[in-house]
């Protein structure tokens, strides 16, 4: 059995690839490199450049690699951009998820783990918010993800497919070992933007809205370390592989921080001050949202990196590597993104593996042979 990870060259998908490798399981990665980065995929991981909306490509990967589970990360994720260009978000996040699901059903994939978002809740009337709260997304991004959730639930009811929907809160940090971090061109994540400003890659940063009904007037968010989130995906998949029922799960720590609190924490970790400018509210931003993740913890998931300064420290270490060019990825420049290539790698790793005689929780794959071959997708 093998896992297919869409968007595996991106921030969260890439860290999930590392989590699988850390436990001895080698996934297959599919990414179109529109925002992902080829260098984020470790050597030895089979990697295909292509579109999740290409049903025939996905079906070939499923059949050729005996895929039993798909972890679907590939998506557009910027809320203001979704307001400005909603049809592009419905195409990439909803229509292409439909196509991917069709290929999964045709290929008899048993398990589907979906990357969703707390944006489906909109501006909840109370926090921490649980999975039973009525969804009321404020943006096309949130609605595109909620539509995909509905499709997945209906597909599971009709076909032999079980799912886990993971609703992320605000993802932050970087691999503690320094192997990977956030490298997306034009990323809008608060901690990344603040660190880029601290490192003088930006001349200033903006705080969008200071009149929200929160203690200091800025938005409050629940920040979850990307490595803890990656392990949440493994816990969800193990639950499904062990015969567990389909689930919808919040992914957060249950503690909120305001934008000002996060910026002040970045200043302390980076030991530098930087310019902050006030800007109007952005469309689609709720005032405050914090997770109740009790259901995820029932699957055995336990946060290991639940500490805001530590998240910032890990992200800071990564940003310094990017600045120094020591990450192997480098800083993408406007108009010259290193992630913009769309060609198929001329040579790729082919890994033959076998599952050991253990349960799904202790599955270990062994690499018998690594051959360099050219594999054409078209």
Labelled PLM ranges:
Residues 161, 176-177, 206-207:
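Oxidoreductase cofactor-interface core, primarily capturing Rossmann-like NAD(P)-dependent enzymes
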């Amino acid at each position: 059995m093998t896992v297919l990870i869409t968007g595996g060259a991106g921030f969260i998908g890439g860290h999930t690839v590392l989590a699988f490798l850390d436990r001895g399981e080698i996934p297959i990665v599919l990414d179109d490199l529109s925002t992902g980065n080829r260098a984020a995929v470790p050597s030895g991981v089979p990697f295909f450049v292509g579109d999740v909306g290409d049903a025939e490509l996905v079906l070939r990967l499923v059949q050729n690699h005996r895929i039993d589970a798909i972890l679907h990360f590939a998506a557009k994720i910027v809320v203001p951009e979704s307001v400005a260009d909603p049809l592009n978000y419905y195409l990439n996040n909803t229509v292409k998820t439909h196509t991917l699901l069709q290929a999964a059903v045709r290929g008899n994939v048993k398990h589907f783990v979906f990357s969703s978002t707390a944006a489906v809740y909109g501006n909840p009337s109370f926090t921490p918010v649980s999975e039973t709260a009525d969804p009321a997304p404020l943006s096309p991004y949130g609605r595109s993800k909620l539509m995909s959730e509905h499709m997945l639930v209906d597909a599971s009811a009709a076909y032999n497919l079980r799912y886990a929907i993971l609703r992320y809160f605000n993802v932050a940090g970087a691999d503690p070992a320094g192997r990977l971090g956030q490298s997306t061109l034009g990323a809008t994540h608060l901690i990344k933007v603040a660190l880029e400003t601290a490192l003088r890659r930006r001349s200033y940063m903006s705080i969008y809205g200071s009149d929200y009904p929160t203690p200091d007037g800025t938005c409050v968010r629940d920040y979850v370390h990307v490595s803890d989130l990656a392990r949440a995906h493994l816990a969800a998949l193990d639950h499904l592989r062990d015969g567990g029922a389909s689930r919808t799960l919040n992914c957060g720590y249950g503690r909120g921080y305001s934008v000002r609190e996060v910026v002040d924490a970045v200043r302390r970790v980076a030991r530098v001050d930087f310019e902050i400018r006030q800007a109007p509210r952005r469309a689609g931003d709720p005032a405050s949202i914090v997770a109740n993740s009790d259901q995820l913890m029932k699957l055995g998931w336990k946060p290991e990196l639940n500490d805001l300064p530590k998240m910032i420290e890990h992200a800071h270490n990564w940003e310094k590597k990017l600045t120094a060019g020591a990450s192997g990825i480098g800083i993408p420049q406007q108009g010259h993104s290193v992630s913009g290539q769309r060609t198929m790698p001329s040579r790729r790793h082919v890994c033959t593996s076998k599952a050991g005689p253990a349960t799904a929780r202790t599955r270990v794959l062994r690499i018998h042979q690594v051959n360099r071959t050219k594999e054409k997708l078209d």
